[in-house]
């Protein structure tokens, strides 16, 4: 109202000047306080009035009390695994554990007290035929097939033919170390046979079964195989008995021959000619490591043959050679 009276007192010219003054002030404050209010004067004239700028903010009020906790949110995804931290300090030593059970005897103890032959196993009460561990003179353990049933038992089997599943036409190295399977046919190895028969006097038994189920055998007073330096020479005692007859004495003192080492007395290689490995002379009366030909065969003397038994044209179903310390 006071402003209106001032404007009337100034007259039209004063009102115009007052209006221009306010316009100038409004332009200067446009950047900070741009709001302009237009008010009416008497008559049709109007006057624009600039609203003042807001004052400075007052001081902050006291902090209000904390609101109630909101509901717990869902668990977030696992973060990336961090690096392993440094090792912690070494813990205290734990208490001493309970004493363990007594273990199996060591090899040295087993060698000192273990069996040397299948016959020794038999005297210790092992009456079942099968594979057993014995210890050679150099303390080497050897798994062997023990025949505890035939002719009083206690025989160590070193050769077995039974089904033709194993190839016996092999080289010197194979016969040296042995080959075959515990489940069927095998040759124990000339080194092992030498070690077994070097312990003392051993008798030899040869058991044969034909494909008609007929059993034959031949038994010798002594049997030994020399070492490799003597080419595994056959050292054989006299023939004792047996319905198979004697077809091994003609091989006495002969060296062992294979397809790759010819040590026989023949101009050719008996091992190659008769497809085997044996103590060939020139050439053989027996060939138990020959081809597995399943009974009668038209080829000559190249099967599992025993001349004084079924002759040179019959290959036995089963052949076993075994020794027993006397």
UniProtKB/Swiss-Prot annotation:
The keyword Nuclease does not apply. It is found in: Secreted; Cell membrane. Residues 90-104 have a biased composition (Basic and acidic residues). Glycans are attached at residues 265, 313. Belongs to the ficolin lectin family. The lineage of its organism: Eukaryota, Metazoa, Chordata, Craniata, Vertebrata. Most abundantly expressed in placenta and lung. It comes from Sus scrofa. Residues 155-243 are annotated as: B domain. One of its GO terms (molecular function) is carbohydrate derivative binding. This is Ficolin-1. GO terms for cellular component: collagen trimer; collagen-containing extracellular matrix; extracellular space; plasma membrane. Residues 1-29 form the signal peptide. Residues 61-71, 78-89 have a biased composition (Low complexity). It is a peripheral membrane protein. Its main location: secreted. The fibrinogen C-terminal domain mediates calcium-dependent binding to carbohydrates and tethering to the cell surface in monocytes and granulocytes. The domain undergoes a conformational switch at pH under 6.2, and looses its carbohydrate-binding ability. Disulfide bonds join 111-139, 118-146, 270-283. It holds the Pfam family Collagen. Residues 61-110 are annotated as: Disordered. Residues 115-154 are annotated as: A domain. Ca(2+) binds at residues 262, 264. The record marks 300, 312 as: Mediates specificity for sialic acids. Keywords: Calcium, Cell membrane, Collagen, Disulfide bond, Glycoprotein, Immunity, Innate immunity, Lectin, Membrane, Metal-binding, Repeat, Secreted, Signal. A carbohydrate binds at residues 282-284. Residues 55-93 form the Collagen-like domain. Residues 109-326 form the Fibrinogen C-terminal domain. Homotrimer. Interacts with elastin/ELN. Interacts (via Fibrinogen C-terminal domain) with FFAR2. Interacts with CRP; may regulate monocyte activation by FCN1.
